[in-house]
A protein has these predicted regions:
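Short acidic/polar hinge/loop motifs at secondary-structure boundaries
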Residues: 121-148
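Conserved C-terminal beta-signal and adjacent last beta-strands/turns
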Residues: 196-198, 202, 207, 251-253, ...
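Outer-membrane beta-barrel signature, preferentially recognizing the C-terminal barrel domain
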Residues: 288-305, 419-426, 482-536, 545-571, ...
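Short, acidic, small-residue-rich periplasmic hinge/interaction motif at the N-terminus
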Residues: 26-73, 110
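Gram-negative outer-membrane beta-barrel transporters
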Residues: 437-444, 527-535, 554-629, 664
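Extracytoplasmic beta-strand/coil segments of soluble accessory domains associated
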Residues: 49, 53-65, 81-124, 142
Length: 695
């Protein structure tokens, strides 16, 4: 990786913005202390992810978690996924391919998580989270709202186990302009800025961040090439022992403008020079440097005074996504040998493609019936996968013949052997929901959403939520919901070296039942307890089918998980806050590709040492992880990782912070398949220092 360079235009913009906005900084503002919210503020915190209107998390018709910008600062999070790891029921698993952070809810696969940024799904048509997914910088985040449980009745596809909506800092929310820099381990360097203004009655918001890192490079003693291929074919092509290289760059720019009922948002994200470290097969790849870019343009209209009992919301979203593997994935190293011969350049696989989506949705809220609030609406989505380019020097040629070992790259684009066909998917959706206050302290929410897909059919997903304000200290909820995951293009249409597609697939399904309690015995102590039953069906996996030469994607099997999520918040004093959570999952005996930990725990303390100093300590414990079916390796041992962040705010302008991650330098590993026998080592002790200036 080349070293980080601050773009001169970026610095110039920071300087110009500081000159133009100094007058907007209120020098009489109180000094902000970046610790977790007081318990009173936490209880009254309102969310919108579970309903059309604002509700406190305890009264929302779902199991809700909220992470604020203050939480992000206090804990030293620099990426979205740093913060998600601290939520009960969520585990962020590091994937060996590209060091991607994959978000798992309640022991489900990451493909069953819906992640949105300002309501825009971050999923793509082929790879789920995206082949080069790396999270997002926290400098642009205002808050994160999370549903632990099904979300398809609200958001449609993929919210089987949970839904996350990241709300960025937009027009009207940025009260101070800010510029900051951060430097740390692994030659990591970051610069960011944000600016809010009002121009001729139009509220303007702007954020930008540049990021560059060489990444932590874990030692892989034995990769798949050494463990399997070299053993099978008596060769010595492996690059192990060797380091998996995980460097990458990121540029993130976001603009918003708002006036009256209208809001415009434009986001651009580019990840470049992204080293994948290990291929999807678990083979060291020091060559690949991929990149992707995403552009979103969103227009929103909101009118809460359309009529006496009516509101109107409309949105039009345009999205573009493209990615490519640069000079190609080195699927196997130079000198690789199999029963077809020897490949002097190794196995090279070049992928490029683009996607564009157009989404229109309109909804209204009617409150003209006593004690009822009825929301209904619908919309249309068009998703177009185009510009698919695929070249490789192995496998099957477009005419169905074998590509001879040692051949140059062959263009598979447009053939049935390309990694994906160029296709357009159309989705029509309709939703209806009623919230009924049928008695004092009782509220029933009932609704459903219908989605019709042009390539696999339709699905309807209901939800019911009964919320009872049991006492002035206790809130009880009983929640039922169904959800689905749409089959990906790869599962429906693409033949790979490992599996055949199946155009007759049904969506994966789930049914979830939650029993939740929120109890606040005093103003200083809050306890949340959630019991859940999570049943999945029609799971899509590769299985052997009689008469076929390869495994094929099929709907097969059920998987049930029962669990408990317990969390507590204690404001011990005005200076000290303590919070903790514990998750227990009890899956059935069904096999899963990679098992998740059954037990997880988290502890956090925030201590305001003085009017200028704040100190955060947090620790995460991940229990032992069972191996997948046919994996005879020992169970992977538990690990605990502690982080600490010390922040100093000199005035309402300057702030400084130092953060140490994996403070005790624990030897922690992420579970992998058998292709990486020693699993994936996680980063050891690392640190960063940052400075930010408000104006």
């Amino acid at each position: 990786m080349t070293k980080f360079r601050l773009n001169s235009a970026f610095l110039g913009l920071c300087f110009a913005t500081s000159l133009s906005s100094t007058s907007f900084a209120d020098t009489n503002d109180k000094l902000e202390h970046f610790i977790s919210l007081s318990l009173e503020d936490l209880i009254s915190l309102e969310t919108t992810i579970a309903t059309a209107s604002k509700r406190t998390a305890s009264k929302a018709p779902a199991v809700i978690s909220v992470i604020t910008a203050d939480d992000l600062k206090a804990t030293g999070a620099t990426n979205l996924t740093d913060a998600l790891q601290n939520v009960p029921g969520i585990h962020v698993r590091t994937d060996a391919f590209g060091n991607r952070p994959l978000v798992h809810f309640r022991g489900a696969n990451a493909t069953q998580t819906l992640l949105m940024i300002n309501g825009n799904s971050m999923r793509d048509l082929i790879w789920g989270f995206g082949i080069f997914w790396k999270g997002m910088p926290v400098s642009a985040i205002e808050r994160i709202e999370i549903i632990r449980g099904p979300g398809s009745a609200l958001f449609g596809a993929d919210a089987i186990a949970g839904a996350i909506n990241v709300i960025t800092k937009t027009a009207g929310q940025i009260k101070h302009s800010e510029a900051g820099v951060r430097t740390g381990s692994f030659n990591t360097r970051t610069a960011w800025m944000q600016h809010g203004d009002n121009w001729r009655g139009i509220e303007i918001g702007f954020t930008a961040e540049l990021y560059d890192t060489e990444g932590y490079n874990p030692l892989i003693p034995v990769d798949r090439q050494a463990a399997f291929e070299d053993q099978t074919f008596a060769s010595n092509a492996t690059l192990s022992p060797g380091n998996a290289q995980y460097g990458w760059r990121n540029q993130d720019v976001r603009f918003s403008a708002a006036k009256d009922h209208w809001r415009l948002q434009a986001d651009y994200t580019r990840r470049s020079d992204l080293e994948i470290g290990l291929t999807g097969f678990g083979v060291l790849d020091p060559v690949t440097q991929g990149n992707d870019e995403r552009f979103n343009l969103d227009l929103f209209y909101n009118n809460d005074t359309l009529g006496k009992h009516w509101t109107l919301d409309a949105e039009l979203r345009l999205q573009h996504l493209s990615y490519n593997s640069g000079n190609g994935f080195q699927e196997r190293p130079p000198g690789y040998t199999d029963n077809t011969g020897t490949y002097p350049d190794g196995l090279i696989n070049i992928n490029r493609s683009s996607e564009r989506s157009i989404i229109f949705e309109v909804s209204t809220l009617y409150s003209g019936i006593k004690d009822h609030s009825i929301r209904l609406g619908g919309g249309h989505t068009s998703q177009d996968l185009y510009s698919v380019k695929h070249l490789q020097n192995f496998g099957t040629a477009p005419d169905g013949s074998d590509i001879i070992a040692g051949s140059p790259l062959v263009d598979l684009s447009g053939s049935s052997y390309a990694f994906s066909p160029e296709k357009i998917r159309h989705i029509n959706q309709f939703f209806l929901e009623d919230t009924w206050n049928f008695a004092p302290d009782w509220e029933l929410t009932a609704g459903a959403r219908y989605d019709n897909y042009s390539d696999f059919g339709s699905t309807t997903n209901p939800r019911l939520a009964l919320v009872w304000q049991t006492t002035n200290k206790l809130t009880s909820k009983l929640i039922y919901g169904q959800a689905f995951r749409a089959p990906s293009y790869q599962e429906l249409f693409v033949e790979t070296s490992r599996a055949l597609p199946n155009p007759d697939l049904n969506p994966e399904r789930s049914e979830t039942l939650d029993l939740a309690f929120s109890y606040s015995s005093t103003k200083n102590w809050l306890v949340n307890l959630n019991l859940f039953y999570f049943d999945q069906s029609d799971l899509i996996s590769r299985i052997t089918v009689a008469g076929l030469s390869k495994k094929q994607f099929q709907n097969t099997g059920n998987y049930t998980i029962r669990g408990v999520e317990l969390e507590t918040h204690w404001q011990a004093s005005k200076q000290l806050n303590i919070s903790a959570n514990y998750t227990l999952r009890n899956p059935d005996s069904s096999s899963a590709p990679i098992q998740k930990a059954k037990k997880e725990a988290y502890l956090r303390t925030d201590w305001k040492l003085s009017s200028h100093w704040n100190w955060n300590i947090q620790a995460s414990w991940i229990g032992e992880r069972l191996r997948g079916a046919n994996d005879t390796r020992d169970t992977l041992a538990p690990y605990a990782i502690a982080d600490t962040t010390l922040r100093y705010a000199q005035s309402n302008t300057w702030e400084f912070a130092v953060s140490i991650r994996n403070l005790l330098d624990k030897d922690a590993k992420e579970i992998t398949g058998r292709s990486i026998p020693g699993d994936l080592p996680l980063a050891g002790r690392n640190a960063y220092a940052e400075a930010r200036y408000k104006f």
